[in-house]
A protein has these predicted regions:
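Substrate-recognition element of Asp-dependent hydrolases with the DxDx(T/V) motif
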Residues: 74-78, 83-111, 115
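Donor nucleotide-activated moiety binding/catalytic core segment of transferases
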Residues: 118-129
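Short, flexible, glycine/charge-rich loop motifs used to bind or transfer phosphoryl groups or to couple energy/partner
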Residues: 15-17, 85-86, 127-129
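Glycine-/proline-rich flexible loop or hinge segments
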Residues: 63-73, 96-97
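Active-site neighborhood of HAD-like aspartate-dependent phosphohydrolases
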Residues: 5-68
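A general structural motif
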Residues: 21-23, 92-94, 122
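Hydrophobic, Leu/Ile/Phe/Ala-enriched alpha-helical segments that form helix-helix packing faces
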Residues: 45, 90, 118-119
């Protein structure tokens, strides 16, 4: 080592530097991630959502959810089997919920009620159309 300069040693054996960890934002979906959409749908129809849509069409599918059941379809959903575990893990990172409502206002209202009843502190809810 005698004749090597410090600069040469650092170039030959670079030391990884800790870099500032960039801030990340976690977005978590509701339907099928936190809430069990399929189970809720089957509760009212006895059918899988896709089978119901194939039989009654997309208009019949959304009519059942938005008109016949309404807000309660969304507000009374069960958690997905691992939904609470996921939420308990990510909540410390201040996640936002990202969800797609139906065209009817009952969906947005029902989802907001579900969040209010099930999540504390209340996360920001972003509706994506």
């Amino acid at each position: 080592m005698g004749s090597s300069s410090i600069v040469e040693l650092l170039e030959a054996y670079p030391i990884p530097e800790e870099k500032e960890i960039p801030p990340y934002k976690i977005y978590c979906d509701m339907d099928g991630v936190l809430t069990d959409f399929q189970k809720r749908f089957e509760h009212f129809t006895g059918m899988l959502p896709k089978a119901y849509e194939n039989k009654y069409g997309i208009a019949g599918f959304w009519n059942l959810i938005d008109v016949e059941v309404g807000i309660k379809f969304w507000s009374d959903m069960d958690w997905m089997p691992e939904g609470k575990r996921l939420w308990n893990f990510i909540e410390k990172y201040n996640p936002d919920l990202l969800t797609s409502p139906s065209k009817d206002d009952s969906s947005r209202l029902g989802k907001k009620l579900w969040v209010k009843e099930n999540l504390t502190p209340l996360p920001n809810v972003i509706f994506s159309y």
